[in-house]
Amino acid sequence: LGLNQDYDLSYNFSPKDLVIVGAQRGHGKSFACCNMAVNAQNAGRSVLYFTIEMDQRPILQRMCSMATGVPLGRLIKRNLYEKEWKRIGQWWADRFDGGSEVLADWNVAEDFDKFHYALTRKCELKDKAQLDVFYDPSLTLAKIISTVRQKKIEYPDLGMVIVDYLNQVRRHNAPSRSGQYEWTEQIEISKGLKALAQDQEVLVISAFQTDPKGQVRFSKGIEDAVDASYT
């Protein structure tokens, strides 16, 4: 997964597993999820990434930084060396059929936005080893399930689904009776994600928010459905 060397040596997950990764707010859950997504893509598998708090742009920026080795802070500010611009341009081009041909027509360091516009208009995304980011601030379990089923057809090599993060996924669009983090709902979400992993034969990774002691309320119920929990 790419969490750390010891963890990767200790666990061997199957395509039907549910793994949850816990941390406090602001302690790197999304960074860990992005790192796992990039590692899966590097291994030749497509990844579907559901995000609730951040939209597609910052998620893809993090993935691009990790994949190219370009520091995220300078990538965001566009304060880059020409060789770094070339690596970023190649990363984007590699996601599209015919992307390298489009890249050859542009000086990415001077015209990245125009290059990106031409790339997305002239080329289609590849149907393999893809990173697909789905942003929905009102994400529900039903939406996750329907989207994964659709994308499994679009990307036959879909190997990982990431949900960032479990605490904020809802069963349906109606507001929770007990507030945003109603624990019985979280238990049902956990069970639903495990059922999805088994039904679609994909590894499902979900971040979850913990308290300062590294625990989540009624965590035993949530963890009953998971194959591994990492905090």
Q: What are these regions, as identified by a protein language model?
A:
Residues 4, 8-10, 42-156, 214, ...:
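Cytosolic-facing regulatory segments adjacent to core modules
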Residues 14-23, 45:
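Pre-Walker A (Motif I) flank of P-loop NTPase domains
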Residues 26, 184-231:
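Phosphate-binding/switch region of NTP-binding enzymes
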Residues 32-36, 59:
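Hydrophobic positions on the alpha1 helix immediately C-terminal to the Walker A/P-loop
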Residues 35-43:
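Walker A/P-loop NTP-binding motif
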Residues 77-80, 132-136, 171-187:
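Flexible beta-alpha connector loops of hexameric P-loop NTPases
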Residues 166:
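Conserved Walker B
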